[in-house]
Amino acid sequence: MNRLNPFSKSHSKNSNENNEVSLADVAESDTRRHWLGLTKREFKLMGFAGAGFFLDSYDLFIINLVSPIYEYLYWGGLEGKKPHYPSGIHGLVNAAANIGNVFGQILFGFMGDFFGRKFVYGKEMIVVIIATVLVIALPKSIPTPLGKMMWIFAWRWLLGLGIGGDYPMSATITSERSLLSRRGTLLSIVFSFQGFGTLAGAIVTIILLACFEKPLNQRGEYTKLEGVWRLQMGLALVPALLVLIPRLTMKESKSYEQSKALNKYTDNDTYIADDDEPKKDNQNVVEEKQINLTTSSDSHPTSTEDFGDKRASTVPTSENTSGFIEYFSQWHHFKHLLATAVSWFLLDIAFYGVNLNQSVILKAIGFSSGKNEYHTLMRGAIGNLIIAIAGYVPGYWFTVFLVEKLGRKWIQLQGLFITGLMFAILAGSWDTISTGGRFACFVIAQFFSNFGPNATTFLYPAEVFPARVRGTAHGLSAALGKCGAILASLLFNFLTSVIGYGNVMWIFCGCMWGAIFFTLLLPETKMRDADEIDREEVLRGGNGKTHQGRWSWYFNGIF
């Protein structure tokens, strides 16, 4: 059973066992399901991959709760005075981690395809740990507020670099270690840890403020906020250290091993073996050694006998960028990359525009006002907690339980439409709707963002692309998404001061509804094996298996 453990270092002596688990092993593992129907193997995978997303979310969104403290401490916002925190600097600090994300997602995604999942996984966590220590080590000797913000910006950029690496690597590793019928559920569980990270940020802030209540609220010693924000950010080191060693010692993905050991093809598609086997043309390879990695039911998962020793029916290796360029030079592949990237970009403009500025928005709608700075901070943290409990976390778990029933495409489409509708309601009635009404709209928008595109934009690149380009394609999609987050971070405070909150909500609405068109380009990936489709294209030509019938436009994607 060690072969079922993704973290085991044991190696089978049997050549077949080196390729894949047997039918008996899979059947045995699937009968021992525990919490949420997970096997022990899946539970470990969810823990180590999910803990990374818990940390990612905590680190990305804690700045939303720390920013008001920066206003009070460094920008003259104490004693009821209006802070002089420039909107450009404010936006830059908020965007720092997302800017780093872009570079991290592309860099680690490419390295994951080029060097292997094992070589890369865990290195991103080392970057996160180093960056977190440097952020909270902000020297008090830096004399100016601008200098302090530049220190924080620099190291939160590095933090974002590490966090960005976690997106493509965790998605790819989870996708490649999952049965087809469980893949969407497992990917959704991993991504749902983002909700717990956001929830934890609000809870930690409330606890820390309560611990500092006497000096802050009763004695007005607001210099103690230095300790509060450093603890808020520094506590992220706990999950980072817990998952570091398991990630560094994780075995290589079987799918990646197969893709690297695959046959190479010449320009005329002649088969070239990795050993001394004679060359054969594609048709002979298909006839003699055709394999099938997926079936229509769970009772027939991949077995060792499907592979054989020659590995003849697998896709070509991708040891350089030529394979990536060749794959996406075809429109029916490129449109999927275009759709995953642009829909993620449009989503993140609205999603991060709200989440990175949630405390500011709560203050604008009148929820987080208080009689002094302490009460304002506490009310802001409580508002974030309510939104996380009522909308953020439940949305993720609706996706977990329904993704294999409704499919990815339906969840993404309905989430985009309803979230856009909430922004339209806010935009059209911003000056007339009550505080409670605004708050309810934001809660509903958060729910359908997460029972919708925020989860599925993460799932799609992990499922729609084959293993040989999966890491890079996921990294590029996520990176363009983070460009949307950066845009929102940099422009939100400026735009709200120029055109008002209502018009900004119209922009968010347009982004959500605009993403609907790009979603229609995508196929439904439920029970879809991208590697099998890729093999059929390489060995036989054509577009691989597609859905036929009146709903083909939906299941295959338009154009």
Swiss-Prot record:
One of its GO terms (molecular function) is phosphate transmembrane transporter activity. Its main location: membrane. Residues 291-305 have a biased composition (Polar residues). GO terms for cellular component: cell periphery; fungal-type vacuole; Golgi apparatus; plasma membrane. GO terms for biological process: monoatomic anion transport; phosphate ion transmembrane transport. The modification Phosphoserine is found at residues 297, 299. It is found in: Membrane. The keyword Phosphoprotein applies. It is a multi-pass membrane protein. CDD domains: MFS_PhT (cd17364). It comes from the Eukaryota. The keyword Phosphoprotein applies. Keywords: Membrane, Phosphate transport, Phosphoprotein, Transmembrane, Transmembrane helix, Transport. High-affinity transporter for external inorganic phosphate. Belongs to the major facilitator superfamily. Sugar transporter (TC 2.A.1.1) family. This is Putative inorganic phosphate transporter C23D3.12. The lineage of its organism: Eukaryota, Fungi, Dikarya, Ascomycota, Taphrinomycotina.
